[in-house]
């Protein structure tokens, strides 16, 4: 189930984001989290199954557009379709928006058929 990021999930969110190639350094990771926490057009969502948060997807909302900035799944839950489920849930949440990828999410989104 896709849920909106809340501050009490910060450590989990940072851990999941750290799997992204661009988020390896702590300072960069902290800057990214600050963007999501302070900019209304930056939205961060977590994927929860039962009581476990196992995935994260971050987007920038622009006029009629959703640009996927970050997508990551806990390594022990990969290759189970979690990433695709997160993208589908986002498309259900923003049905009238065009979805775009950035250079780091493009290959994955292409596999999802976007």
Stretches with model-predicted labels:
Residues 1-28:
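Short amphipathic alpha-helix that is part of the acyltransferase structural core
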Residues 35-39:
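Short loop/turn motifs at secondary-structure junctions and domain boundaries
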Residues 41-55:
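Conserved beta-hairpin
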Residues 73, 79-92:
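Conserved acetyl-CoA-binding loop-helix of GNAT-fold acetyltransferases
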